[in-house]
């Protein structure tokens, strides 16, 4: 039905925007990633780094290889090529700037709270899922 497909479309678009990432080890806010769509494909770039991080806003990707080695993490495109499958964004990749590794990635909104996004990175059969928190602004410190 038309109503159903409009609902799916709204659902597919609703993970665009600003998301706070949380450090798994400390539980502290780490960065803000902006998720945006380009030609129906989802991408994410780092738009803010909290001061508590390694080198704060000046952090470089010292563990990255190739062109990304030692590049600033602020502004870095870390999520790429995710496509909507009807229930989640999948088939893309996500880079963890802390270890320089790129993982296969999927993302989906928490069905009980659309201000929480599940972000799962896979290497082979192993995976880790993080929860990102929606925000509507970038701090101005």
Model-identified regions with their sequence ranges:
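Bacterial N-terminal signal peptides
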Residues: 1-7
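General beta-strand recognition
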Residues: 20, 43, 90-91, 116-118, ...
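N-terminal helix-cap/turn-to-beta initiation motif at the start of protein domains
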Residues: 9-17
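C-terminal terminal-subdomain/extension
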Residues: 104-109, 114-118
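Central antiparallel beta-sheet cores of small beta-barrel/beta-sandwich binding domains
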Residues: 23, 28-105
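Short aromatic-glycine motifs in intrinsically disordered, low-complexity regions
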Residues: 64-69, 116-124
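Edge beta-strand at a domain terminus
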Residues: 114, 122-141
